[in-house]
Amino acid sequence: MHLYKTSTPSTRNGAVDSQVKSNPRNNLIYGQHRCGKGRNARGIITAGHRGGGHKRLYRKIDFRRNEKNIYGRIVTIEYDPNRNAYICLIHYGDGEKRYILHPRGAIIGDTIVSGTEVPIKMGNALPLTDMPLGTAIHNIEITLGKGGQLARAAGAVAKLIAKEGKSATLKLPSGEVRLISKNCSATVGQVGNVGANQKSLGRAGSKCWLGKRPVVRGVVMNPVDHPHGGGEGRAPIGRKKPTTPWGYPALGRRSRKRNKYSDSLILRRRSK
């Protein structure tokens, strides 16, 4: 991490990653057309504060880890503009080259492997049934063979707390406790770049490069734009409770859909 000198207001307290480079392999990237910018098919804003941003090349990440029982070596640790975690380029013994999420503490030259009954070592991928209780894991499958879908953000880590019957009980980074099939795979260890959420960008322009627009309070808008808007001067919102721009209750109302198939698999809801 490189901290800028406090020479100008725009760079004061800013920080950038100086050690991690971005020089991806051509056969592991492809262009993507980012359309919508938070709009739906009618052109109406459905997700706020999105738009602009620098062009990106998508890196193909191996979330399935289906190179079974073939050892690979970490060749580079690279920056990925599509996620806040770093990625590693792996050279496998059979000549295959793939990107994976960078496990915390992994360095260039380390070896990894995936499969059944492989060592419980940082970066190795194996089924939950072969892991001891208390193992810290990330990149967890929900559906067998579909690839990791849980605990993939920077610093994310889940914990295997029980195994019974055909299911394993996991405590996820959100605090949720849920059941997953013991045959699903996961990667040992924690995702790297733990301090990603504590990094100071230093200026508004750096936020714009990430494709994030300014956040504006509803109370300073016009009535046509937000239910909180309008009034003379600094006026209250004029309602009993805060609402979203579309008039639905905000700040506390549960937004999860009812009667989902996974309701029976969640033993304890996530903590807020």
UniProtKB/Swiss-Prot annotation:
Gene3D superfamilies: 2.30.30.30, Nucleic acid-binding proteins, Ribosomal protein L2, domain 3. GO terms for molecular function: rRNA binding; structural constituent of ribosome; transferase activity. Its main location: plastid. InterPro entries: NA-bd_OB-fold (IPR012340), Rib_uL2_dom2 (IPR014722), Ribosomal_uL2 (IPR002171), Ribosomal_uL2_bac/org-type (IPR005880), Ribosomal_uL2_C (IPR022669), Ribosomal_uL2_CS (IPR022671), Ribosomal_uL2_dom3 (IPR014726), Ribosomal_uL2_RNA-bd_dom (IPR022666). One of its GO terms (cellular component) is chloroplast. GO terms for biological process: mitochondrial translation. It is found in: Plastid, Chloroplast. The keyword ATP-binding does not apply. Residues 1-13 have a biased composition (Polar residues). Keywords: Chloroplast, Plastid, Ribonucleoprotein, Ribosomal protein. Residues 1-27, 222-272 are annotated as: Disordered. The keyword Secreted does not apply. HAMAP family: Ribosomal_uL2_B. Belongs to the universal ribosomal protein uL2 family. Part of the 50S ribosomal subunit. This is Large ribosomal subunit protein uL2cz/uL2cy. It comes from Buxus microphylla (Littleleaf boxwood).
